[in-house]
Amino acid sequence: MNVFIKITFSFLLLLNFSATAQIKQQNIARIDQMPDLPKPLQIIDYKKLALDFDKTVYDFKAKGKFWPMVWIDTSQKNFPQPVVGLYTAVGDVRQGSNRNKGMFHEALATMGATLGATLVGIDKKQHFNYVGMLKNYFNKGTNWNIMMNNTCPEVALLGGGYGRDWWYDVYPNLLFYAVYDQYPNEPGFEEIAKTIADKFYEADVILNGNYEYSYFDYNTMKPMTNHICAQPDVAAGHAWVLYSAYKKFGDQKYLKGALSALSALEAQPKNPTYEVLMPFGAYLSARINAEHGTKYNTAKMLDWTFDGTPVCREGWGALVGNWNGIDISGTFGSTVDHGGYGFLMNTYDAAWPLIPMVRYDQSYATVIGKWMLNAANASRFFYPQYMPDQHETIPELAEVTKGVIAYEGIIKQSGYKEYENLKAPVAQGDGPLWVLGENPKESQFSVYGSGHVGIFGSIIRETNVKGILQLNLLTTDFFSDKAYPTYLYYNPFTTAKTVTVATKKAEKVNIYNTVSGIFIARNVSVSSKIKIDALDSAVLVFVPADGKITYQDNKMLVNNVIVDYNFQQIK
């Protein structure tokens, strides 16, 4: 009798779970154009790739042509300490200890690699303190007093947009704040973080809702215009940093600044997307709506992120397409350049805000799960070991990558005359164009983009069902409140599938699905089988089995920890 009751109870749980989701799922038109199940399907082990990248690239004794990829810059800019330099691209002639006094290295590369490694469990303070070295990018010598893409103006014109291309000046501050979240006790970081937030707050006050500028001079505190497009999506970068500062330090000024910058972004009359910052606006919209009861238009910001409709930065967004039997959908970059040109770093970094966004608005669970499956599948093709040789510009030179460095991009038709007859998709990179006639062919391999692999590596795990991923919604949800383990699962198949989800041993949990608004399993101590309907999703939260459930406004909590931000939406 008892056995029958247990079996019946489990059966009812599965029935309840496979019913129509009570949180209505929203669409994103661009993602609707992507395949539910991309082909050929193969999800590589991004965590292992991130671990291998760190071990291989941060080897000062590495042998081989163009190796090692790191050096020590002893110029002591901004702080009396050395800083590690990381090549932007393989063989880049601008870089290394003997070029430009060893000073030309980019925060996008070093901060991205530091963050990526940390997210997969590597302590970047061991041996050398690579974390503390990042302080050298804090440009106090110029009185800008923010993190910048280089350590000083002496190398500004070599590339990387220093002091003239707004996203290049703002994005390193997001990277720094993410690293700060992971290393909160690093000496000097708190003061730097507050100084950056103060600068961004003051800039937002001066801008007063108008972000239609090419860059902002954070020394003179004046917005500037040059030949580069206006970049109003920088408001998303300001807002993300300011909200992170608010969560960290509790100063209402920072919240006010975040809301102001986000409102400026939302008020844009046309798609303001420029490079990488727009998805942070979508994430912040969902999060602030959930945490503060605001009504920011998350749907509009997600459409802007994906749909490829910006005018000045023409076509920038998510790519869609099957090129000669290879799905490249989900990669981010230009949707129009030579038929479409997706970039590795942009694709990796889009997951940083978009995946944790689902915690705060589970109505996007299915569509974001679908995008992530496409992006995770397509991103392997940036790597020469996974892209067929006939679709690469320099497969004969791939050995130099040591299996951890990818091409910078994937393009429909190569922009290089000598490769224009290759069939799409074509893996290539822009490195040779940066220093014409000097940068080698191998500079098509992107060290800077490859260093961000830890973002994917920290989020993506395969399940027992090929094609259904487990996506960790917490790893890149920086400066978040306490949360229980939370995962997104998307079923790309036209039939229901049963997925085995594991829990920590010796800890009994109840499993709650924020999409259906019910507990789907109780007192689980090892694993549980979860049924997911066709083309549906689940956001599973693993809460203490003996936890006390309470409600606050439209939130459901267990032991005073928010589990569902939108509980009252469920009918």
Residue ranges and their predicted role:
Residues 22-156, 185-213:
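Low-complexity, Ser/Thr/Pro/Gly-enriched N-terminal "stalk/linker" regions
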Residues 33, 37-40, 108-125, 169-187, ...:
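Well-ordered alpha-helical scaffold segments within catalytic/enzyme domains
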Residues 79-108, 150-170, 221-234, 265-278, ...:
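Solvent-exposed loop and edge beta-strand segments that line ligand/cofactor-binding
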Residues 178-252, 260, 264-267, 283, ...:
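Active-site lining segments of carbohydrate-active enzymes
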Residues 203-207, 215-219, 268-280, 284-433:
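Extended ligand-binding clefts on enzyme/binding-domain cores
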Residues 429, 433-506:
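Carbohydrate-binding surface patches
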Residues 523-570:
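C-terminal beta-strand-rich structural cap/linker in extracellular carbohydrate-active enzymes
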